[in-house]
C-alpha cells in the first residue's frame, strides 16, 4: 500500500511540516505553521487542511533528546502534542530522534547562501524534512 507520512518539527512558536512521497522514500518541505503553545494554539486547524490534502497514514514528530539520549521537558511537550494530534485526527503518531536536526538545517541553509532573514522562515520546515527523512531511512522497505 502506498501512502504518505507527514513529518513535524514542533516548537513553542512554530511547527515545521514536511511530507513523504507515496513510496516513503523522500521527504519534501511543505510549510511552517505559526503556533502559540502557551495559549493552547497548536496549529490543528491548518494541520487539518494539510491532512485532508495529503491523506497521510501516519505523522512523525521530532523528539528532542539530550545528547546523552535522555528525554527532558521538550520531549515531554512533543509527546503531549503527539497525543493531542492522534486524538484530534485519529492518525498513528511515531517519534524520531531530532538531535542536531535544527543545526543541520541551519548549516544547509548557510552553505546554500540563504540570508539570515530567509533562514528564519525556512529552518523549521527543513528540520521537519530532516526528521522525516531520518525516519524514512530507518524504516525503509527492503526491496
Swiss-Prot record:
The superkingdom listed in its UniProt entry is: Bacteria
- What compartments host this protein? Cytoplasm
Q: Which GO terms describe its biological process?
A: rRNA 5'-end processing
Nucleotide-binding found in the keyword field: no
Q: Quote the SUPFAM superfamilies the UniProt record gives.
A: Ribonuclease H-like (SSF53098)
Q: What is its EC number?
A: 3.1.-.-
| Intrachain S-S bonds | none
| GO CC annotations, alphabetized | cytosol
Alphabetical list of InterPro entries matching this protein = RNaseH-like_sf, YqgF, YqgF/RNaseH-like_dom, YqgF/RNaseH-like_dom_sf
User: What's a Gene Ontology MF term here?
Assistant: nuclease activity
What keywords sit in the KW lines?
A: Cytoplasm, Hydrolase, Nuclease, Ribosome biogenesis
Question: Function of this protein?
Answer: Could be a nuclease involved in processing of the 5'-end of pre-16S rRNA.
Q: What PANTHER family does the database record attribute to this sequence?
A: POLYNUCLEOTIDYL TRANSFERASE, RIBONUCLEASE H-LIKE SUPERFAMILY PROTEIN
Sequence similarity: Belongs to the YqgF nuclease family.
Protein name as it appears in the record:
Putative pre-16S rRNA nuclease
Phylogenetic placement of the source organism: Bacteria, Bacillati, Bacillota, Bacilli, Lactobacillales
